[in-house]
């Protein structure tokens, strides 16, 4: 089934277009990088649609709003954990101006760049990988519930109980990507489509 999806010429064109959008983000401003960081903080324990909607409500508050203003905007967006995420967003501002530097680390070693991102409160392995993929770095797996559902077809134990388990599943995903001659981040788009019928992520 996966191989059939990967061979679909029309879908491949859409995937490559999406990948090009990610790669263009590498050259984007620090403001764009920070917006993507906040989006990834918001996606933790939330749906992408819920996180994206919340980000639209926030607007420039991510840069200039107080913790109370951010929390209020998140509540108005119907977002879960508004107080916690407001605090994470405020604290993440200390990385504004440093994110493209992390990108330069990713140019030589994406795993090292992900480790740096893990120091940001609100980011786990999945969210840090998601951020890097959205900024054009395609060698890391975003192991979310859709990818775990994909793994359930092949593996008995696919729960992420630790960082080492994430690495283990990422290694399996990397092997599948290699067999299909695809970067890990591109295979992720195909699997996401296979499990949701959608391409955006």
From Swiss-Prot:
Database matches in InterPro entries: DNA_glyclase/AP_lyase_Ogg, DNA_glycosylase, HhH-GPD_domain, HhH_base_excis_C
Keyword Amino-acid biosynthesis: no
Any GO BP annotation: base-excision repair
GO molecular function: class I DNA-(apurinic or apyrimidinic site) endonuclease activity; hydrolase activity, hydrolyzing N-glycosyl compounds
Active site, renumbered: 126, 144
One Pfam family matching this protein: Ogg-HhH
UniProt superkingdom: Archaea
UniProt catalytic activity: 2'-deoxyribonucleotide-(2'-deoxyribose 5'-phosphate)-2'-deoxyribonucleotide-DNA = a 3'-end 2'-deoxyribonucleotide-(2,3-dehydro-2,3-deoxyribose 5'-phosphate)-DNA + a 5'-end 5'-phospho-2'-deoxyribonucleoside-DNA + H(+)
EC number, as in UniProt: 3.2.2.-, 4.2.99.18
Family, per entry: Belongs to the type-2 OGG1 family.
Function description: Catalyzes the excision of an oxidatively damaged form of guanine (7,8-dihydro-8-oxoguanine = 8-oxoG) from DNA. Also cleaves the DNA backbone at apurinic/apyrimidinic sites (AP sites).
UniProt protein name: 8-oxoguanine DNA glycosylase/AP lyase
Organism: Metallosphaera sedula (strain ATCC 51363 / DSM 5348 / JCM 9185 / NBRC 15509 / TH2)
